[in-house]
Amino acid sequence: MADGRDPWQVFFDRRFLGNTRVDLCSRILKRELLRDWLDRECEPGATTVYLGFDGDEAARMARAATYWAPWTVRAPLLEDPPMDKDDVRDLMRMVGLKEPRLYALGFKHNNCGGFCVKAGHEQFQLLLKHFPERFDAHARREQELRVFLGKDVAILRDRRGGRMRPLTLVEFRRRALANEQLDCFGGSDCACFTPEPETA
């Protein structure tokens, strides 16, 4: 199942730039698409939705179970004993599976080619380091959307000096290459199948 659009097309169509609080791309291209398919094709009493939450993501399960009701939701990596990503990688090595490339490069999630509007500075720094052409392509799209909307919006936030303001990917790149301090302490968590309260 596929919508046929990429995240940037969704942002242009909805006239809104996804960010750490509102992930239109995940909502439209993942959650709503799957939800519509489940509604059409699956009996709730005979269908279980399996999610790949690991032991570090247990807090996401309650929201996910509420969102995906009336289907039963399971996250096998949270079941006894819970497994975190290191446990999963160890198990993969034991059975001869190769570690997903993005994990091997330090990304916390192996999705969307390392790009995620819900991610933080840490993930974007990794994207710039390992895939600079991909980072630059997203920076161009962000700038195009800013012009299209006529607004000072950005995926990231600058929290320096106690003030919060938009931090474009172009400016983030400049700061990263100048070795200026970035906010790389909050991780780069994914929430694709765990909806947050949205304002868009």
Regions found by a protein language model. Give the residues of each.
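Nucleotide-activated chemistry modules centered on ATP-dependent adenylation/adenylyltransferase
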Residues: M1-A200
